[in-house]
Regions:
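Predominantly soluble domains enriched in secretory-pathway, periplasmic, or organellar proteins
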Residues: 1-219
């Protein structure tokens, strides 16, 4: 198991002994992790430096899992946070920008060539989840009156329509998970318990229930 530490490193946890057996230094304030091609990709946001002269980080660290050392840092758009790997040797990164003149941006990393490209099909996103060759994304920048939802086929590299097909309205989406053919969207106002919206493979809501404050993940 790999764990990101906000002090700038990633740890490897032995699941048998439950001991941390190794650590590797990466970028500032590492966020999410994705494994592809025997490498670990780490989004470094630098989020704790947002108000300083240093500012946000704008790198993704590449860690060789055989040696557990950082072998490369890739430049991406400012403030990368979310990261997902597909089965085609690509890693997708959502950079949050600076919440002003640099917008949220979805990028694709080729894990063999390390080429980074921005997705023109769906340039903006806040959160994403992945399952079975498909990215499920939403864009809900602060102050937006109507959040946007979309799918992206990672095999054909084509954008689809919203994964919500029954007109269900979610005003303040907070996180998204894709598990077992279903998509779960959490809604939160940062003050009260959040709700979980459960959508089937047909895009229709089949259940909604209350969770705790700021629900992050469904597994």
């Amino acid at each position: 198991v790999y764990i990101s530490y906000y002090n700038g490193c990633v740890a490897r946890l032995d699941t048998a002994s439950l001991e941390v057996e190794a650590k590797v230094k990466v970028g500032r304030n590492p966020e999410q992790l994705a494994v592809s091609s025997n490498k670990l990709f780490v989004s470094n946001s630098g989020g704790m430096d947002y108000s300083t002269e240093v500012g946000y980080d704008k790198t993704v660290s590449v860690v060789d899992l055989s040696t557990f050392t950082e072998i490369k840092k890739l430049d991406v758009v400012l403030n990368p946070t979310r990261i997902q790997a597909d089965e085609q040797g690509n890693v997708y990164v959502v950079s949050m920008g600076n919440y002003a003149d640099i917008p949220n941006t979805v990028q694709k990393i080729n894990t063999e060539t390390y080429e980074v490209t921005s997705l023109t099909h769906w340039p903006n996103a806040t959160e994403m989840a992945y399952e079975d060759g498909k990215l499920f994304l939403f864009y809900a920048q602060w102050g937006m009156s109507h959040p946007a939802f979309l799918t992206f086929d990672t095999k054909s590299q084509s954008a689809g329509t919203s994964f919500i097909t029954d007109g269900t309205s979610i005003q303040s989406p907070y996180s998204i998970s894709a598990v077992g053919g279903n998509v779960y969207v959490a809604e939160s106002d940062y003050k009260n318990n959040g709700d979980i919206y459960c959508f089937g493979g047909d895009g229709k809501l089949f259940k909604k229930f209350e969770a705790g404050l700021n629900p992050m993940k469904v597994v």
